[in-house]
């Protein structure tokens, strides 16, 4: 399981039932931050929170988190080239509130911490080119083929940081679905080169790096290998929610600079969730 605030907080995850609106409040809960109503930034459109959206499509919140990871160690001598976050770490059911969507407009610190609930640590580590491509294959391996119903989307699906992109063909077999990959605007050769001296510095949460969502078979002990230079984020306790909130404040502080979803993953022959008219 991902790292959480405490055992008691995890056991307290008694989620309220939806009642035809966007949110339903639990009977009792405690705010996760000192000022839950403080606005940390603005959303440029409605953001849907069902698993079909967070785990099977591009997603504004997932892209925000990946961007925050990318820039978490900008002041280090070896900053990240790519930030990734698994869709399974984005939660619609929080300790206090269950949501189906976030409306366009202001996003509060309390909302953001409910959505990024587990307080995973952010770690930057060197991956070989093969590990990077295999990581992307793990990300898209469980995507449903076009025409299929998305019934149990995998939390392993990765959202990518700005400047990087992925093209995936779901008609191809698992392990051979990645058709194109760029990191920081530079194309990654496919198939990947076997030269282990070629490294990509990637920021991710410790849950993935420790093998969660099936990534152990890809990453092995990379997070514990000094030769991979693993570095935990130093600011704001090093946790994903705090780092993302600070990044949101700096990059999307006004409606004019509102967060917008981008097409960073291009899907070919893949099932996609149906979006309401106008989105």
Regions found by a protein language model. Name each.
Residues 1-9:
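Bacterial N-terminal signal peptides that target proteins for export
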Residues 9, 13-17:
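Hydrophobic alpha-helical targeting segments used for export or membrane insertion
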Residues 19-21:
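C-terminal motif of bacterial Sec signal peptides marking the signal peptidase cleavage site
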Residues 23-279:
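Catalytic centers of hydrolytic enzymes
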